[in-house]
């Protein structure tokens, strides 16, 4: 629903606003009910269907008769005659070739749907109210960025002088509504399927709807040749042209005479309608459409139960498995771990240096042993006419190279010092 009390009238020739304003009709304050509009639209759209069905003679245009019993064949009617492969074949049944379908569609189905009169009127009022909400109009796909106001009202003088389509296009450009027509032109596509052969070749979007009064009849022929633009008398408004595809919020261009007739046709919340007997615009059940304002209102909060705030259960972690919990309980554990890592790194470096040193000693001893063996058994030997150096086997090397007593005493002393330092450091950090 619109909250605008007055509506400005625009001149279609100059595109400027006039000084006179019109009070917003009460029908724009009607409640917007999408469920009612959906029900009415579905029922009314079914009333335009053309009855269709299967011919009563389909699948039965053969000369066929059943052979009866006694021939060990089915009793289905069979094609009469002889001398052809077609003769004797089953006919008529839905399981036979060229037979009729099962349960053929009849044309005496329930094609029309009745809708309560008051519900139809209520749905039209809801669609008119939705057309005054810019958010709904824009959400439906209309291009209204340059439109001066919603609802858009054009004075009747500029409409009544229009006789040619180029004059109607000029008016739409002046009120910044032609961008919606360009959208329709760009959306033209060829329909897929059999509809191309049945008068529905082109698919296109819907453009603005021009609603006129009795004084603006000659402009209808000018507007009807513009793609996507529809025209309708204010007395003949229906859900089919106000909400195409059952989507409310169509962009409507009102003439001044048609806009002033709305209170007479639909009435107000207090006064009965003259154009629709027994109809009165319903009051909106929701006075404030802003749901955010309703939710955070202080008046509502007083009536509601206070929110229950449950105490948060502390998350307990095992410090022996969770390193972050251990550091939180004992900050020194991080420092101790860092120091232990440094000690382990230093020990690894010392061990690597010692291994490299021992490797050099073993290599030197192996070379000395090779030289002594060469002197004893000859420096070289001839194999297949080539001179080859004598190699010492590993077993002989292992038996020959051994630690001296002095080296064993040094290694025992070194291991004892390492163990003593580790024990002393562990006592110092408290492990």
UniProtKB/Swiss-Prot annotation:
Keywords: Cytoplasm, Ribonucleoprotein, Ribosomal protein. Component of the large ribosomal subunit. One of its GO terms (biological process) is translation. Belongs to the universal ribosomal protein uL4 family. GO terms for cellular component: cytosolic large ribosomal subunit. Gene3D superfamilies: 3.40.1370.10. Disulfide bonds: none annotated. It comes from Entamoeba histolytica (strain ATCC 30459 / HM-1:IMSS / ABRM). Component of the large ribosomal subunit. The ribosome is a large ribonucleoprotein complex responsible for the synthesis of proteins in the cell. PROSITE patterns: RIBOSOMAL_L1E (PS00939). One of its GO terms (molecular function) is RNA binding. Its main location: cytoplasm. This is Large ribosomal subunit protein uL4. The keyword Cytoplasm applies. It is found in: Cytoplasm. Residues 82-91 have a biased composition (Gly residues). Residues 77-96 are annotated as: Disordered.
